[in-house]
């Protein structure tokens, strides 16, 4: 008799990961729960939220009768995620730490711990996402050796794992998984990929998981929590006072504590002014922030992004883009925003230009961009480094990637047409 497949499931202390572990248990797998402590923080009442979450994760394991492990990646999180976050903010960009955390912590540190230390056949998380592999195909990856050398054969390229949008398009989290490597995707299960959030809550309620069901869902940047962001960031970065300047007439309207505290499209807090002003440009040399008087001011819109580097989920660009040098797409740069039609252009130096058919508002430095192909094949890449071209022709950088209508895919052809529109 074959031994049960061993799946190590990341438990956050929340309802999603708890139900993910429950569903794996129901499928007959040998499940182990692991709680990751990535940040030392206190809430407003002086209680360590990580300790509380760990207790909730442990209770989940008790209810499900599965082994529980706790690991600390506080040092790794600081070095690979938070330090990068601070560095990007200091440069005036708007990074997404959730994407970096998934890349370096959950799907690298935790992934290797589960496989190497716990002997996992596969790992699992409570993310709302899917891949192109069925469960049994995921387990088979354990016995497939990674190709050696610089080149892979055509079979391996054609069978790159695709990251697909979840059934619940509102809760879909593939945007945050866009930098997960092929190696990790091949060994990962997403039990919630075909479920809605409401159904997940129903499952929790019917299976004695009330303690996680009653918890409020975490939103925003995890290590900031409910704290004032300006006060938080100024604990780590030195204030760099500068001026608020009108984009229309260069008139000085006020002062600020640091240009890194503002992102494009954000309402600027300028004392003494009744009408709202919005950030449209930042001068990193002088530390000045340019603002406009309307939320729909033309200076807020961009229609061209230039990449400095691209990270492909499939580890290489699609053959069609290489062949034709151009490709029609849709893209997004914020989670849950509507997709915008665009055209990808592959340059000789390997950079990619993204030209939006219609200019988009508040495309900020360091954000993640996504796109979906409008043709009969689907592709996607993960975040790249982009520059924005605006009326002021200022050099910018954007971490972006390409997102398919059904989710993040590995820029490799898929035989059937795109169906539906992603949200």
Pin down the residues of each PLM region:
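ATP-dependent adenylation/nucleotidyltransferase module used to activate substrates
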Residues: 1-179, 189, 205, 397, ...
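AMP-forming adenylation/ATP pyrophosphatase catalytic core
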Residues: 40-41, 124-130, 136-423
């Amino acid at each position: 008799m074959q031994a049960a497949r061993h799946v190590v499931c990341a438990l956050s202390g929340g309802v999603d990961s708890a139900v993910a572990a429950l569903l794996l248990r129901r499928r007959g797998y040998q499940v182990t729960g692991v709680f990751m402590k990535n940040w030392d923080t206190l809430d407003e009442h002086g209680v360590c939220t990580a300790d509380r979450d760990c207790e909730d994760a442990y209770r989940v394991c008790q209810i499900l009768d599965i082994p529980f492990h706790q690991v600390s990646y506080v040092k790794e999180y600081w070095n690979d995620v938070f330090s990068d976050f601070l560095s990007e903010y200091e440069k005036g960009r708007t990074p997404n730490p959730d994407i970096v955390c998934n890349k370096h912590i959950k799907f690298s540190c935790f992934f290797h711990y589960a496989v190497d230390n716990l002997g996992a056949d596969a790992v699992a998380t409570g993310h709302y996402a899917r891949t192109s592999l069925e469960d049994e195909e995921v387990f088979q990856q354990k016995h497939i050796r990674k190709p050696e050398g610089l080149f892979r054969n055509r079979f391996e390229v054609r069978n790159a794992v695709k990251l697909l949008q979840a059934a619940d398009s509102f809760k879909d989290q593939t945007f945050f998984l866009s930098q997960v490597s092929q190696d990790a995707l091949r060994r990962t299960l997403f039990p919630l990929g075909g479920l809605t959030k409401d159904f997940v809550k129903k499952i929790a309620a019917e299976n004695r998981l009330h303690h996680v069901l009653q918890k409020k869902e975490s939103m925003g940047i995890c290590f900031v929590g409910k704290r004032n962001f300006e006060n938080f960031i100024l604990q780590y970065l030195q204030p760099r006072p500068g001026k608020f300047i009108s984009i229309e007439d260069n008139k000085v309207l006020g002062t600020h504590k640091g240009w890194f505290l503002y992102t494009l499209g954000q309402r600027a807090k300028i004392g003494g002014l009744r009408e709202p002003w919005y950030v449209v440009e930042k001068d990193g040399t002088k530390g000045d922030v340019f603002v406009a008087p309307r939320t729909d001011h033309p200076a807020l819109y961009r229609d061209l992004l230039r990449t400095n580097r691209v990270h492909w989920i499939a580890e290489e660009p699609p053959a069609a883009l290489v062949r034709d040098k151009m490709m029609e797409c849709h893209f997004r740069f914020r989670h849950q925003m509507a997709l915008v039609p665009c055209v990808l252009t592959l340059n000789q130096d390997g950079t990619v230009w993204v030209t939006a058919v219609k200019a988009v508002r508040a495309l900020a430095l360091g954000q993640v961009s996504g796109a979906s192909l409008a043709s009969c094949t689907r592709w996607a890449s993960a975040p790249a480094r982009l520059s924005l071209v605006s009326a002021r022709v200022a050099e910018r950088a954007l971490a972006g990637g390409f997102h398919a209508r059904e989710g993040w895919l590995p820029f490799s052809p898929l035989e059937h047409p795109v169906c539906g529109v992603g949200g």
